[in-house]
Amino acid sequence: MAVADDIALIRKQEEVLVFPAFDEAVAFKIGSAIRARAIAENLPIIVDIRLWDRPLFYAAMPGSNASNPDWARRKINVVRRFLRSTYRMVLEQQRPDRAFKIGEGLDVSDYVLAGGGFPVTVKGAGVIGVIAVSGLPEREDHGVVIDALCDHLGIDKRGLVLASEAE
């Protein structure tokens, strides 16, 4: 799939994966589903779900490491700043160094171009938070979030899931 096609599909994900409401219980349910998948598939990830003012869910799986929370924090900052998926930002920016252009004024210690951060959007309210996964290749981090959101919202994944890079 071409980069432009992936960007278009991620935009569609951002438009479709919208919550009617989002609170601690919803965050726990989604976080727990991601954690259960990680256990079942031995995924060495961390998951961090938060509103802008506070964390709601966090889990670190065996095999994750000390750098994963920092990667997640920097992904969270990108979603907060740009109100869009970090993987979409990766594809739009096409920067091999994973840093934003100097003119953006974004410190590499606080912002990173890496997939796995996805906005929590509530109908009528807009983007209120973020779900971040770190520990897998960025396209897979992104996919873990998308799968969980589709499952939670009861949305058919067909037509929303990115093809694997091998395809």
Curated annotation (Swiss-Prot):
One Pfam family this sequence matches: HbpS-like
Record's signal peptide: none
InterPro entries reported for this sequence: PduO/GlcC-like, PduO/GlcC-like_sf, YBR137W-like
Similarity annotation: Belongs to the UPF0303 family.
Protein name: UPF0303 protein mlr5144
Gene3D superfamilies reported in the protein's UniProt record: Haem-degrading domain
Lineage: Bacteria, Pseudomonadati, Pseudomonadota, Alphaproteobacteria, Hyphomicrobiales
Record organism: Mesorhizobium japonicum (strain LMG 29417 / CECT 9101 / MAFF 303099) (Mesorhizobium loti (strain MAFF 303099))
